Every structure is written in C-alpha cells, then in structure tokens.
Amino acid sequence: MRVEPITDEQAAAIAEWRYEFPYEWYDTSADPRRVELFANPARRTHLRAVVDDGDELVGFFNFVPEGHEVRLGLGMRPDLTGRGLAQPFIAAGLDYARREWRPRTFRLWVARWNERALRAYRRAGFHEVGRSEESRFVEMERSA
C-alpha cells in the first residue's frame, strides 16, 4: 500500500462510502465537518489517499502535524474492513507521516464502542492515554 495526494475523484468516492451498522457513524454524510473536508479542496491540505498495488483506493489519512506530534484521522473503504488489512494500512500511513514530518508521537481518537478499531490500533502499537469528557472517545498515542 502507498500513500499519495488525494484526487478530486478519490475524495468524491470517499464521501459516498456507507458503513454497515454500527459503523454508519463513520459515514462522511454523518458529520458536516467531514462533508466539508472531502468536498472542499482547500481543506484537504493534509488529506491523503491510500491505494493498493493495483492503484485501487483502500482508504484515507488526514494528517494534522502539530509540533513534534502528528494527529491522525483515517478510514478504510467499507468493503475492506474486517479483512485483515488494518496493519499494513496503518503502517503505510505512519511511514508516510514519519517521512513527511519526522514526529516524535502519533495521536488519534477512536469511538469507545469501536472494539475492532481499538484492537487494530493496539496491535499497531498505540495505547490509551485518555478519554473525552463524555467518555465517548478514547485518546490513543504511540511513539513514532
């Protein structure tokens, strides 16, 4: 898998992704901020596509570099979730961020109920460092 600048076509495709219950919360249309991110090229500064060896879109990363840290937002194409691709997908994004920004740490937030994602992030070396006030989200980090 490789990470590359996102095209308008890829951003439009991601905006159309629909996840099955209970993951529909991750549909782009479920959050106006995500709609704006994918619809507005000016907002895509750190948004990148992840493609496979056949140039098929696998997912995306939204990188937010801040000092010695890179915050991550990411998503995988719905039909590819649960198929054992999480580790190479996450590794591709982390490798890209290391080359681009040389961070000391990576940080992300995940819905507390999303056990599948929590397992994947733990396997990728992330550990819990906090929870949001409402405890809906788990904050995770790992060293770069």
Question: Language model features by range: what are they?
Answer:
Residues 71, 75, 107-109, 139:
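Conserved beta-strand segments that form the floor/walls of ligand-binding pockets within enzyme
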Residues 137-144:
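Terminal substrate-recognition subdomain of acyl/acetyltransferases
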